[in-house]
């Protein structure tokens, strides 16, 4: 079974989230998807930067979901 990763960047200050970004590659396991999701979330936080993260109270959430037939 393949797993898809979707990252969602949110601002607690604005009480809103951007549309989910679905990672183009599929993962072979839940573990691979989750560890990659945590790594990419950290990379994105560093890219956004301390100042903007603190100013807009940014947080990132993600999901790892099994691929449905529509994604095959």
Describe the function of each predicted region:
Residues 18-32:
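A short, exposed loop/beta-hairpin motif centered on an aromatic-Gly-Thr core
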Residues 1-22:
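Short aromatic-glycine-(Arg/Gly/Cys) micro-motifs in beta-strand/loop hairpins
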Residues 4-8, 27, 41-48:
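Short amphipathic alpha-helical surface micro-motifs
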Residues 29, 34-41:
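Short, well-ordered alpha-helical segments
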Residues 16, 23, 39, 70-71:
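Secreted/processed peptides and extracellular or luminal domains of membrane proteins
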Residues 10, 33, 64:
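Short cysteine clusters
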Residues 43-72:
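Short, mixed-charge low-complexity intrinsically disordered segments
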């Amino acid at each position: 079974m393949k797993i898809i990763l979707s990252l969602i960047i949110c601002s607690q200050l604005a009480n809103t989230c951007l549309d989910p970004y679905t990672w183009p590659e599929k993962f072979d396991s839940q573990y691979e998807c989750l560890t990659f999701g945590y790594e990419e979330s950290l990379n994105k936080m560093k890219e956004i930067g301390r100042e903007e993260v603190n100013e807009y109270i940014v947080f990132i959430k993600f999901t790892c979901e099994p691929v449905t037939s529509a994604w095959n």
